[in-house]
Design a protein with these regions (language model features):
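Alpha-helical transmembrane segments
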Residues: 42-47
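Flexible cytoplasmic inter-helical loops of multi-pass small-molecule transporters
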Residues: 26-41, 88-93, 307-313
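C-terminal ends of transmembrane helices
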Residues: 18-31, 53, 83, 89
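Short, hydrophobic transmembrane alpha-helix segments
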Residues: 56-61
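Intrinsic disorder in cytosolic terminal tails and internal cytosolic loops
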Residues: 270, 299-316
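Short, membrane-exposed interhelical loops at transmembrane-helix boundaries
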Residues: 264-278
Length: 316
């Protein structure tokens, strides 16, 4: 049952700890700088409130006073965080890191990409089970296509980015992902598992070609002393993108299903299959558009930054 999904992570986590103890270097570098407790508090509370609003908004309603309050206080907290980081002598995040356009642009592209790709993550399981009638196990076998393609293409794109740069590979990945998302608009009530699997492979390949080069661009343009913060920012962008994307996907899908069916259903997946598919088409069309928008920051990145990464990776 459901508990097994979480139990399976226990041995994986233990194995990861053991491998980390042996594989990761023992960094004995110490610093006298005090930890920025107020800054960490402002950031943690702000992100918590924003993520709560994005998660619960689709259930409570986006105009519910609690959701509006979460957004308002979360955004206010981010302003307080920036104000404090500029003021304190030992900031948790040195905001000057964002003056590097390649670094900031790559983070924006990551946010946009995961915002778009979460549409697929959220909606396709509904399509497989409620439209095609798959049971959870059958749906799981189909959904494995995306991580499978991702695991195969990520190492390849990583090596290629070290040789040819990160910019155009990241753009290629986003284009492939957008094509994969757009291909979901051709699904019908009669589509086969093989057809869905192939579309998911395309999306996974796109993510693989985008993610490794984009992360390399972020880490390659961060000071060595800020590698930890840069890695954390990658995770934050991914989390906010996925959470916001799922909320947006749910809202768009529900609205378009209701419009197509001509009446409201509760739960929404009880609507007729044709209406569910129509809603999926509209949502995936939006997701493909968002994926293309995520190209813009990467397209505007400096070519020189790519050359620096290539030079650094080729240095023995």
């Amino acid at each position: 049952g459901w508990p097994s999904i979480f139990y399976v992570n226990i041995p994986v986590g233990i194995l990861a700890i053991i491998l980390s103890l042996y594989a990761l270097p023992n960094d004995r570098q110490r610093t006298t700088q005090r930890f920025d407790i107020p800054g960490a508090g402002f950031l943690a509370v702000s992100l918590l409130l924003i993520l709560l609003a994005l998660t619960e908004g689709q259930y409570w309603g986006w105009t519910d006073w609690r959701i509006l309050a979460f957004f308002a206080f979360g955004i206010a907290g981010l302003f307080l965080f920036v104000w404090w980081e500029r003021r304190t002598k030992a900031p948790m995040i040195n905001l000057s890191i964002f003056s590097n356009w390649t670094f900031s642009a790559s983070l924006l592209s990551s946010l946009g990409a995961f915002l778009a790709l979460s549409f697929n993550l959220f909606l396709i399981p509904f399509y497989l089970q409620n439209v095609l009638g798959f049971d959870p196990q059958q749906a799981g076998f189909v959904l494995i296509a995306t991580p499978l393609a991702l695991s195969l293409t990520s190492p390849i794109s990583g090596r290629l980015s070290d040789r040819f740069g990160t910019r155009w590979l990241a753009i290629l990945g986003l284009i492939i992902s957008a094509l994969g998302l757009f291909s979901m608009t051709t699904l019908t009530t009669e589509s086969t598992a093989v057809g869905v699997f192939g579309r998911l492979l395309l999306i996974g390949a796109g993510v693989g070609f985008f993610q490794s080069p984009n992360n390399s661009a972020i880490m390659g343009n961060a000071p060595r002393s800020a590698f930890g913060i840069a890695g954390s920012l990658i995770s934050i962008m991914r989390t906010i993108g996925q959470t916001g994307g799922i909320a947006l996907a749910g809202a768009v899908w529900a609205a378009r299903v209701t419009a197509s069916a001509g009446e409201t259903y509760d739960p929404i997946n009880a609507a007729p299959p044709n209406a569910l598919v129509a809603g999926l088409h509209d949502a995936m069309l939006l997701a493909a558009g968002l994926c293309l928008v995520a190209i813009v920051p990467t397209l505007l990145r400096s070519q020189r930054a790519d050359q620096d990464i290539i030079a650094e990776s080729s240095t023995p």
